[in-house]
Amino acid sequence: MIQPQTLLNVADNSGARELMCIRIIGASNRRYAHIGDVIVAVIKEAVPNMSLERSEVVRAVIVRTCKELKRDNGMIIRYDDNAAVVIDQEGNPKGTRVFGAIARELRHLNFTKIVSLAPEVL
């Protein structure tokens, strides 16, 4: 579960290393975000000489959470970290590579470009 002020790792090569959630896109007063939700975040740590810089406000989609994700078939998936992929206004990733495992639920939420870039889909 991701809430405002939560720090997340960045799972792509867009230039950002760490994000801090500042708002959850969706309903007017959502408290938590889960895998597949879009958030507004600020870049807390970035790689030098890249397109994204520190203190820049971006949109990101959550791809991994430490909180368990229960599927309809009873399977429970839990990751070791909270991670997100930086996206543009159309929902396309800003990076060209995605690192780490990605949940299958992103495919049903129309983030197929992120799923196709991922090395492993759980």
Swiss-Prot record:
This is Large ribosomal subunit protein uL14c. Keywords: Chloroplast, Plastid, Ribonucleoprotein, Ribosomal protein, RNA-binding, rRNA-binding. GO terms for cellular component: chloroplast; cytosolic large ribosomal subunit. Its main location: plastid. The keyword Transmembrane helix does not apply. It is found in: Plastid, Chloroplast. PANTHER family: 50S/60S RIBOSOMAL PROTEIN L14/L23 (PTHR11761), LARGE RIBOSOMAL SUBUNIT PROTEIN UL14M (PTHR11761:SF3). InterPro entries: Ribosomal_uL14, Ribosomal_uL14_bac-type, Ribosomal_uL14_CS, Ribosomal_uL14_sf. One of its GO terms (biological process) is translation. Binds to 23S rRNA. Belongs to the universal ribosomal protein uL14 family. GO terms for molecular function: large ribosomal subunit rRNA binding; structural constituent of ribosome. The lineage of its organism: Eukaryota, Viridiplantae, Streptophyta, Embryophyta, Tracheophyta. Part of the 50S ribosomal subunit. PROSITE patterns: RIBOSOMAL_L14.
